[in-house]
Amino acid sequence: MKRKAKTIIAGIVALAVSQGAMADDIKVAIVGAMSGPVAQWGDMEFNGARQAIKDINAKGGIKGDKLVGVEYDDACDPKQAVAVANKIVNDGIQYVIGHLCSSSTQPASDIYEDEGILMISPGATNPELTQRGYQYIMRTAGLDSSQGPTAAKYILETVKPQRIAIIHDKQQYGEGLARSVQDGLKQGNANIVFFDGITAGEKDFSALIARLQKENIDFVYYGGYYPEMGQMLRQARANGLKTQFMGPEGVGNASLSNIAGGAAEGMLVTMPKRYDQDPANKAIVEALKADKKDPSGPYVWITYAAVQSLATAMTRSASHAPLDLVKDLKANGADTVIGPLKWDEKGDLKGFEFGVFQWHADGSSTVAK
């Protein structure tokens, strides 16, 4: 039995990207964090979606029909994500690009699956999302199960630390990644001194830093997002701790440098490839810059690819029924700004690759050697 969507939901932001939608316009929900601690990631997502919709419509839309993005703020909060999902059901929208954080995507996906709404997430990396046999759930993001081993391989083969601490934020995304890295390091017989969690939103890491110093830790892997990592780096360096830090794409954000300052220099981070540096994407990069939008963020491109994939299936398929679009994408794939994409039966991408980058104090990054 399908869940009954709530008819009145408070605190939800829903803004049409284009005004005055016509009867033949195709509405697509764009869901991410406009508010909350990781709103910077939401900025990337919305910028990518807006540019993709603009470019697709400029080329004739979907057989003459325009895409209209309707934006919702879930703040990467699970409860708010459920409220947003119910709002989308009430709004009669059949297609969702989002959510971004794994912890908010999973509960929302339950509603979309029950209601027959196609969801393509550009950011949820936790493998559990697609392990439940759902038909309507897909993603253009890679998985923690591939990002974690990429980090572990680099740590074992390049860094070769002697005493490792693995820390996470006790959230689905961060802890999942931390455990994936832990598994990879254990296979390589690395010396993991401790594995522990902090509280998301925490700002005082004096006790943790004292512990790192006491245990002579020379390498820290942190599974989580940039607000906490930025504070850790800043406080560690202020206390004379020279330990190497590493994190996932959730920490690779210019806002980390705003928090950590010079302490951000040299942090290691696993991220998708730099799609803004692909010559094939030059026109999109220039369009984003002309609109005063940063084209360097990974979620700009992964979200653009999600919208592209949806549009490709709509153009190819005789039916716009969500399940027919899912079947089309799984059978035929899609050519996108991040390359040709293929999906398995669970809705996961085949062969998505992460790279290891060195972060710099000015918010830029270069491929790690």
Curated annotation (Swiss-Prot):
Main localization, broad class: periplasm
Keyword annotations: Amino-acid transport, Disulfide bond, Periplasm, Signal, Transport
Top-rank lineage group of the source organism: Bacteria
Alphabetized CDD domains for the sequence: PBP1_ABC_LIVBP-like
Function, as annotated: This protein is a component of the leucine-specific transport system, which is one of the two periplasmic binding protein-dependent transport systems of the high-affinity transport of the branched-chain amino acids.
GO terms under cellular component: outer membrane-bounded periplasmic space
Signal peptide limits: 1-23
Family, similarity comment: Belongs to the leucine-binding protein family.
Name the UniProt record assigns to this protein: Leucine-specific-binding protein
Pfam families: Peripla_BP_6
Source species of the chain: Salmonella typhimurium (strain LT2 / SGSC1412 / ATCC 700720)
Localization in the cell: Periplasm
SS bond partners: 76-101
Biological processes annotated in GO: isoleucine transport; L-leucine transport; valine transport
